[in-house]
């Protein structure tokens, strides 16, 4: 009996230590270089330090190099996150064959069963949408001409307590703004670890071209802090 109690205590202490190890993340790109980025397709960093996702008849993406923890599998705790970026989309076209810019949370492993969650700034269908695996969960119309060639501010937040993903877009030069939000349990959609970043795709048309620049980007994620008593109860329930 004594040895069993000691084993339980040892396991409890190991799990309690692990419970404190959920990974909060914070980074800030005031300007970009290729360090700490995974660039795919035509994605590049300009001489001005802008992240450029210009593409014709193809797809490109740029993700932060380190995976981001969304859920702690030991405690079931889910992270809240807050990301801000400045983007500039300039469209020159005679046909609707370009579709703007996406902010995306994607699986780390390509063959994962986890879904992809994206916020689309869609210049083809003139809408801002929250999508899961390209299925529209919630969308609002926007007039992309209000932002064309302008430095627009974007903020995307997820509150793990209220389960709300919220998006706001604003143009400081004109005062125009758009907002959309949706209730979502990201832990049911995403893997415990994801990559975060941007993607863009374009159709082909001789006279269609869209420049998409991200001028700056910050991201932070944080797990709610259980008290020692709450962590103890969670872990004891796991091992008893």
From Swiss-Prot:
Molecular function GO labels? alpha-amylase inhibitor activity; carbohydrate binding
The answer to whether keyword Glycoprotein applies is yes
Write down the superkingdom of origin: Eukaryota
Signal sequence interval, chain numbering: 1-21
Keywords in alphabetical order, please: Alpha-amylase inhibitor, Glycoprotein, Lectin, Signal
Q: Which InterPro entries does this entry report, sorted A to Z?
A: ConA-like_dom_sf (IPR013320), L-lectin (IPR016363), Lectin_LegA_CS (IPR000985), Lectin_legB_Mn/Ca_BS (IPR019825), Legume_lectin_dom (IPR001220), Leguminous_Lectin (IPR050258)
Which residue numbers fall in the propeptide? 234-240
Q: Which residues are glycosylated?
A: 33, 84, 88
The family assignment reads: Belongs to the leguminous lectin family.
**Functional note:** Lectin and alpha-amylase inhibitor. Acts as a defensive protein against insects.
What subunit structure does UniProt give? Heterodimer of chain 1 and chain 2.
- What this protein is called in its record is Alpha-amylase inhibitor 2
Q: Which organism was this protein described from?
A: Phaseolus vulgaris
Q: What are the top taxonomic ranks of the organism? A: Eukaryota, Viridiplantae, Streptophyta, Embryophyta, Tracheophyta
């Amino acid at each position: 009996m004594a040895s069993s109690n000691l084993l339980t205590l040892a396991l409890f202490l190991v799990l309690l230590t692990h419970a404190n190890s959920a990974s909060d993340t914070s980074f800030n790109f005031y300007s970009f270089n290729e360090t700490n980025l995974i660039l795919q397709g035509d994605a590049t960093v300009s001489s001005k330090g802008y992240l450029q996702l210009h593409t014709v008849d193809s797809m490109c993406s740029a993700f932060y190099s380190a995976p981001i923890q969304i859920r702690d599998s030991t405690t079931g705790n889910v992270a809240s996150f807050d990301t801000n970026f400045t983007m500039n989309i300039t469209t020159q076209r005679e046909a609707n064959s370009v579709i703007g810019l996406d902010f995306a949370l994607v699986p780390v492993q390509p063959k994962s069963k986890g879904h992809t969650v994206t916020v689309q700034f869609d210049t083809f269908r003139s809408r801002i949408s929250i999508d899961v695996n390209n299925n529209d969960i919630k969308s609002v119309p926007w007039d992309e001409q209000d932002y064309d060639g302008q430095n627009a501010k974007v903020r995307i937040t997820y509150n793990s307590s209220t389960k709300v993903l919220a998006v706001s877009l604003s143009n400081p030069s004109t005062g125009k703004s758009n907002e959309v939000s949706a209730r979502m349990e990201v832990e049911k959609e995403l893997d415990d670890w994801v990559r975060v970043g941007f993607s863009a795709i374009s159709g082909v048309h001789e006279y269609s071209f869209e420049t998409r620049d991200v001028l700056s980007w910050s991201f932070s994620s944080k797990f709610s802090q259980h008290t020692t008593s709450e962590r103890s109860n969670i872990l004891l329930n796991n091992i008893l």
